[in-house]
């Protein structure tokens, strides 16, 4: 059953206020030096998670349902969002894959415009442009960090702790232009003003948050520059949606398993070509493998998206080329007219549509066509995979494996074994 909350009037968010500086602070109660002195937030310290990401442990439900959702609803009641996302229509598109469509006209009309080049994945942080130090402190929910004590097996929650400017905290904030219920941002080391680029510590923190939430319906996503990130300040997005994403149901073919137990597979029969990375002896093993691959993509100016799924147990790494095709005039006017920017949620099968006509006419064929335009070609995907496997220190024998499979396919009457990896129980999907 989907959660429902009361609709309230929307007021201007601090994201939208002007930036006129006033004596004694800028007047916006922001995170910059002008206002941060004396700022306090709750602090959530999760237990030490240096364990196998496949290990089942009991996590407290208060993290997601009481803290994230409770604080998010509080900000909703205070009118800090640009529109009421709970009033947006959502449906599952009929068909084999179960693409999810949402009509979100407010996000199109009121979302902050992109303020950087879309043809470069790595760009320096620019403090003159919008960044998260300019948000109002009321949009922040809490500080989040992982324990560094190997013996810590319990969470620690402090209701009010100073924001330590000398040791830049990681914070969770509302997304004032939400896509779904409980849509938040994880902003690693917010005061360090890091540009939107993956690093090992930040990706590990995102996996720790997913593991701590311990709910398959709470997912984190990352968009690089050039893959429809709109703010060049390091952040991950997360929200709660109580249904399975199409990408989570996709079949996969194992390419290799690393020495530390991380399994890397490629997606099959899905419109976007991508990699599924899972397992590992510890959560850090998984984070390091995906970080190495992501850094490789960044350094080679290849835009990409990341979906952290199944409570941090599975990560989908999805290189894309839609912005490049747009710039080259290779995208059809029909797709351009929809004004859909295929970021991580759309790549995963949650289609955020901005026009009622597109929502009413949504079909599996149209969703597939859009995502197929986003995907790298098979040839380019092979090239990118070679780069990735070189970066993580492994050779991809994908071509040889495929030739063997084709041979087995012809010998066995046209069948071979692939891996089907649903992330949540089927009975839960039907709700």
UniProtKB/Swiss-Prot annotation:
GO terms for molecular function: GDP-D-glucose phosphorylase activity; GDP-L-galactose phosphorylase activity; guanyl-nucleotide exchange factor activity; hydrolase activity; nucleotide binding; quercetin 4'-O-glucosyltransferase activity. Residues 398-417 are annotated as: Disordered. Its main location: cytoplasm. Residues 398-407 have a biased composition (Acidic residues). It catalyses: GDP-beta-L-galactose + phosphate = beta-L-galactose 1-phosphate + GDP + H(+). One of its GO terms (biological process) is response to ozone. One of its GO terms (cellular component) is nucleus. The active site is at 235 (tele-gmp-histidine intermediate). Expressed in leaves, stems, roots, flowers and siliques. Keywords: Ascorbate biosynthesis, Cytoplasm, Guanine-nucleotide releasing factor, Hydrolase, Nucleotide-binding, Nucleotidyltransferase, Nucleus, Transferase. Induction: By jasmonate, ozone and high light. Circadian-regulation, with a peak in expression at the beginning of the light cycle. It comes from the Eukaryota. It is an enzyme of class 2 (transferase). Interacts with TLP1. Belongs to the GDPGP1 family. PANTHER family: GDP-D-GLUCOSE PHOSPHORYLASE 1, GDP-L-GALACTOSE PHOSPHORYLASE 2. This is GDP-L-galactose phosphorylase 2.
């Amino acid at each position: 059953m989907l959660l429902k909350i009361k609709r309230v009037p929307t007021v201007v968010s601090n994201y939208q206020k002007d930036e006129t500086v006033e004596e004694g602070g800028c007047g916006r109660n922001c995170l910059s030096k002008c206002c941060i002195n004396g700022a306090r937030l709750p602090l959530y310290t999760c237990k030490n998670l240096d364990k196998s990401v496949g290990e089942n442990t009991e996590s407290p439900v208060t993290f997601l349902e009481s803290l994230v959702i409770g604080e998010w609803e509080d900000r909703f009641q205070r009118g800090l969002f640009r529109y009421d996302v709970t009033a947006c229509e959502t449906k599952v598109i009929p068909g084999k894959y179960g693409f999810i469509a949402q009509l979100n006209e407010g996000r199109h009309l009121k979302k902050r415009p992109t303020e950087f080049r879309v043809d470069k994945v790595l760009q320096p942080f620019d403090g003159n442009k919008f960044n998260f130090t300019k948000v109002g402190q009321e949009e922040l929910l809490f500080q989040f960090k992982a324990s560094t004590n190997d013996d810590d097996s319990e969470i620690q929650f402090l209701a009010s702790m100073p924001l330590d400017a000398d040791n830049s905290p990681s914070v969770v904030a509302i997304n004032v232009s939400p896509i779904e219920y409980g849509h938040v941002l994880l902003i690693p080391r917010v005061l360090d003003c890091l540009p939107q680029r993956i690093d090992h510590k930040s990706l590990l923190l995102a996996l720790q948050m997913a593991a701590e939430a311990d709910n398959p319906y709470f997912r984190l996503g990352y968009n690089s520059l050039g893959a429809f990130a709109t703010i060049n300040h390091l952040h991950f997005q997360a929200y709660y949606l109580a249904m399975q994403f199409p990408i989570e149901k996709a079949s996969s073919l194992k390419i290799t398993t690393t020495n530390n137990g991380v399994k890397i597979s490629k997606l099959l029969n899905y419109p976007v070509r991508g990699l599924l990375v899972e397992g590992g002896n510890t959560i850090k093993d998984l984070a390091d493998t995906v970080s190495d691959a992501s850094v490789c993509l960044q350094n080679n100016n290849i835009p990409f998206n990341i979906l952290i799924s199944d409570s941090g147990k599975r990560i989908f790494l999805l290189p894309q080329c839609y912005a490049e095709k747009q710039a080259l005039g290779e995208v059809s006017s029909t797709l351009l007219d929809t004004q859909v920017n295929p970021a991580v949620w759309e790549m995963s099968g949650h289609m955020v549509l901005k026009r009622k006509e597109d929502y009413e006419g949504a079909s599996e064929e149209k969703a597939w066509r859009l995502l197929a335009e986003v995907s790298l070609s098979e040839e380019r995907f092979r090239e990118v995979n070679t780069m990735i496997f070189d970066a993580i220190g492994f050779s991809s024998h994908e071509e040889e494996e495929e030739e063997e499979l084709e041979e087995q396919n012809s010998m066995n009457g046209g069948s071979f074994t692939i891996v089907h990896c649903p992330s949540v129980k089927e009975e839960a999907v039907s709700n």
